[in-house]
């Protein structure tokens, strides 16, 4: 077993249905529950809890109830490794998580060596599954597919303009920016600027001045919503009237809170919104009745639990390796994202990425709507 001296793990157990017993199946939830990306952690937590409650009410995994164990990775690879080691030490055999590619990739090695199957609801970097470990699955799409859509969109719509591609130097952000750049170039357009900033930066005035001087008309951001919101707001404040485009790392209502009215017209790629599927109406109402809007990765986490439970029941076993085999061979599995099958790498069969635009909804609040 790999061990780590990293500390600071926030770990607690939740009994999903009734009292804990030695026969319960422990499922770890690895996500950023604190820090700048806690909004995504909350989405994952809520989605997993709701799906586990439903699964346990229907008999759990092969008749065994599911107990959830939480690990706060704070979107930090080092803390993620600490979470993974703690999960392994506690006997967790299944993990829904992690969210960030930079956390999921190193933790997956620990899980693979210790017989733990993981299903990542938001890890989009292709490397995660391209290594073809036995235990890595995701319920989200990949950045190479996302970059194709974003790059072509910019080449088609801004061919007479100038594009800046920015990223946050993380495996997710830079990986997405690189895939988008590749697609942009393959579609006959060359970016004017390609630059990285540090995750956590708050003052982008120098970068914005540089983009203004270069005559930038479209900005692509590979990164998360905290920096995106600041970039959008500061671009408006400094008079840079360029179209802002990003990926699935900004799909949080916190983006509008940070950017303010400047968020209007911002575009991003993401999968079709499960909230638009009438089959999910009852589930959506249940979330909203509890004061929670099930945006973004809520449904991807929910689908992760559904895939795990359905595969285990199809295999007639709760052994992680047997469940992994069933996930690849016994699909499709019915989920809130639709019927999902997994290929030999652990990637799901999902519809392509589409473009969204941020604008005010009927409730007067900003949200992202499919174009």
Curated annotation (Swiss-Prot):
SUPFAM superfamilies from the UniProt entry: Periplasmic binding protein-like I
Keyword annotations of the record: Amino-acid transport, Signal, Transport
Disulphide connectivity of cysteines: none
Gene3D superfamilies the UniProt entry points to: 3.40.50.2300
Acetylation among keywords: no
GO biological process: amino acid transport
Position of the signal peptide: 1-23
Biological function: Component of an amino-acid transport system.
Family per similarity comment: Belongs to the leucine-binding protein family.
Record-given protein name: Leu/Ile/Val-binding protein homolog 2
Organism of origin: Brucella suis biovar 1 (strain 1330)
């Amino acid at each position: 077993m790999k061990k780590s001296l990293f500390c600071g793990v926030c770990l607690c157990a939740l009994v999903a249905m009734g009292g804990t017993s030695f026969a319960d199946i422990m499922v770890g939830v690895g996500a950023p529950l604190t820090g700048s990306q806690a909004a995504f952690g909350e989405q994952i937590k809520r989605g997993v809890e709701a799906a586990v409650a439903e699964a346990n009410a229907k008999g759990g995994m092969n008749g065994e109830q599911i107990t959830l164990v939480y690990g706060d990775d704070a979107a930090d690879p080092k803390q993620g490794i600490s979470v993974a080691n703690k999960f392994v030490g506690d006997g967790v055999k299944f993990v829904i998580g992690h969210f960030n590619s930079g956390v999921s990739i190193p933790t997956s090695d620990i899980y693979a060596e210790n017989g733990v199957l993981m299903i990542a609801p938001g890890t989009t970097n292709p490397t995660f599954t391209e290594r073809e470990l036995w235990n890595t699955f995701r319920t989200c799409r990949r950045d190479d597919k996302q970059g194709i859509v974003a790059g072509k969109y910019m080449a088609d719509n801004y061919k007479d303009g100038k594009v800046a591609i920015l990223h946050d130097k993380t495996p997710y952000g830079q990986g997405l920016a690189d895939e988008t750049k590749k697609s942009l170039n393959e579609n006959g357009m060359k970016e004017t600027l390609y630059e990285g900033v540090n995750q956590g930066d708050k003052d982008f005035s120098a970068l914005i001045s540089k983009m203004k001087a270069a005559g930038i008309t479209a900005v692509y951001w590979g990164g998360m919503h905290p920096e995106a919101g600041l970039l959008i707001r500061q671009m408006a404040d400094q008079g840079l009237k360029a179209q802002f485009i990003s990926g699935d790392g900004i799909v949080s209502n916190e983006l509008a809170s940070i950017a303010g009215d400047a968020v209007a017209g911002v575009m991003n790629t993401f999968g079709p919104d499960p909230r638009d599927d009438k089959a999910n109406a009852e589930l959506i109402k249940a979330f909203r009745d509890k004061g929670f809007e099930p945006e973004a990765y809520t449904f991807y986490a929910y689908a992760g639990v559904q895939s795990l439970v359905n595969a285990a029941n199809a295999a007639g076993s709760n052994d992680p390796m047997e469940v992994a085999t069933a996930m690849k061979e016994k699909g499709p599995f019915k989920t809130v994202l639709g019927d999902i099958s997994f290929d030999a790498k652990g990637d799901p069969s999902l519809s392509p990425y589409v473009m969204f635009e941020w604008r005010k909804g009927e409730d007067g609040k900003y949200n992202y709507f499919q174009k």
